[in-house]
A protein has these predicted regions:
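N-terminal leader/capping segments at the start of a protein or of a new domain
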Residues: 1-47
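Asparagine-centered strand-capping/turn motif at beta-strand->loop junctions
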Residues: 144-148
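A short hydrophobic beta-strand segment most commonly corresponding to one strand
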Residues: 100-102, 149-166
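A short glycine-rich, His/Asp/Glu-containing loop-to-beta-strand
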Residues: 55-86
Length: 176
């Protein structure tokens, strides 16, 4: 029963998001509405448990699992559930599409960057935790950071499925 309810509620939420963004260029205001829709979905803790979406085993080399919950046939409006159980740090990157990250359980720090002559420079940071989220426009660089300890569960939604983002831009010490 929970699986059927989960599929229905996810479908209803993605339909609202799709309608909100239909036939217009993405803006920070639209992304803010998408973030609010996903915060509402995240409040349905009865549908998203660590039992149904477990993090990697403690002896695994992986520190996070990404579960695809929904994606349109054309690979748009891709919604994932990210679950992490260990130290996770991603280098600064630009998804080249919009992204919204919303907390369900635990804390994920998002740091934001501008390009600089020597690579990138941090300009802001926000903690994603239950009831909060961040919205990221195409062309914006960010990183995610999760500390080991308590599991973290978040929604990550993108304008295109991750497997379709062949032009993503990453910055690290080797790439200046």
């Amino acid at each position: 029963m929970a699986g059927e309810d989960r599929r229905r509620v996810i479908s209803e939420t993605v339909d609202r998001i799709r309608n909100r963004a239909a036939n217009q260029e993405m803006t920070p205001e639209i992304l803010s509405g998408i973030k609010d829709d996903l915060i509402g979905l995240a409040a349905r803790r009865d549908l998203f448990s660590l039992e149904d979406f477990p993090p990697p085993a403690t002896d695994s080399k992986r520190r996070s699992c990404l579960y695809r919950l929904s994606e349109d046939d054309d690979h748009g409006f891709a919604l994932y559930l990210n679950v992490a159980s260990g130290d996770v740090s991603a280098p600064p990157h630009d998804h080249t599409t919009w992204a919204v990250i919303v907390g369900i359980e635990g804390q994920e720090e998002n740091r934001f960057y501008n390009e600089a002559p020597e690579g990138v420079e941090q300009i802001d940071s926000k903690m994603v935790e239950p009831g909060t989220g961040v919205a990221i426009m195409p062309g914006e660089f960010h990183t995610i950071h999760i500390n080991a300890g308590k599991p973290v569960m978040n929604f990550h939604m993108y304008g295109r499925g991750l497997e379709q983002l062949h032009e993503r831009k990453f910055w690290n010490e080797r790439k200046r």
